[in-house]
């Protein structure tokens, strides 16, 4: 079933050796547009993204980039990353992507504008070409391009993402994807102690953190994946079921598994 395929895809080669793969391929969307809401602080931005996701407008992307600010050792400049003609205002970006047929997209954007009550908000709409450029930059993490700092990937319940940011005291360069459930973060001169502190905060809020890129300042971290003890025990039992002799990449994801 799908649960098994998801489990194997996320196991980094620690559970099975795959000899044959079947892909289900879907047609690419005919067109796409992106509704940008400017100059929102993190709390109202995440609230708007949550409303958009729970609506009937079938959105396919929801991300938030905070406004330019001073972050130690990081360049926090979204205007430099997103130089697009259709962006009419500066400041933070709250982006919602809609895909499908042209008529359907235009109608759903109109619906969203009404449902989110955006009549008095500063907004922009990216056409298909600029929309694709925008989301490719999001996907390729161009916000962190040329960075020599550590890059962390944090998955957290959407309801907890704002609390986590406040606990981190805005000391890091970051943006949110998945409507607030996925946080990408750049950390300057990250030490083992700092990383451990971030781990504890993330786990406290029901999430997990992965070290995607090490810096020269912290070239090695023993555990790049972080989960709470309950999930660790589940992962350990799964490992025993699939690979009881621990032949396949032992210790790659978690020490002792």
For each feature predicted by the language model, list its residue ranges.
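C-terminal substrate-binding/cap subdomain adjacent to the FAD-binding core in PCMH-type
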Residues: 1-144
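Conserved glycine-rich FAD pyrophosphate-binding loop
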Residues: 119-257
């Amino acid at each position: 079933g799908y649960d098994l395929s998801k489990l194997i895809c996320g196991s980094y080669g620690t559970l099975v050796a795959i000899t044959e793969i079947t892909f289900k391929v879907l047609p690419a969307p005919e067109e796409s547009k992106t509704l940008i809401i400017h100059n929102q602080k993190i709390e109202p931005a995440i609230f708007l993204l949550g409303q958009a996701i729970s609506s009937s407008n079938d959105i396919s992307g929801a991300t938030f980039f905070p406004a330019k600010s001073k972050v130690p050792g990081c360049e926090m400049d979204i205007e430099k990353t997103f130089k697009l003609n259709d962006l009419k205002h500066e400041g933070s970006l709250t982006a919602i992507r809609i895909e499908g047929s042209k008529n359907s997209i235009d109608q759903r954007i109109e619906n969203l504008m009404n449902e989110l009550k955006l009549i008095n908000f500063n907004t922009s709409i990216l056409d298909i070409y600029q929309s694709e450029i925008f989301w490719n930059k999001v996907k390729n993490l161009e916000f962190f391009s040329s960075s020599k700092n550590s890059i962390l990937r944090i998955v957290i319940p959407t309801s907890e993402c704002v609390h986590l940011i406040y606990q981190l005291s805005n000391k890091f360069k970051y943006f949110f994807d998945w409507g607030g459930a996925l946080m990408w973060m750049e950390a300057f001169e990250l030490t083992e102690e700092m990383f451990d502190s971030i781990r504890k905060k993330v786990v406290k809020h029901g999430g997990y953190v992965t070290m995607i890129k090490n810096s020269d300042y912290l070239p090695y971290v023993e555990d790049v994946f972080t989960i709470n003890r309950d999930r660790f025990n589940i992962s350990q039992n799964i490992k025993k079921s699939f690979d009881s002799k621990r032949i396949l990449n032992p210790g790659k994801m978690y020490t002792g598994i």
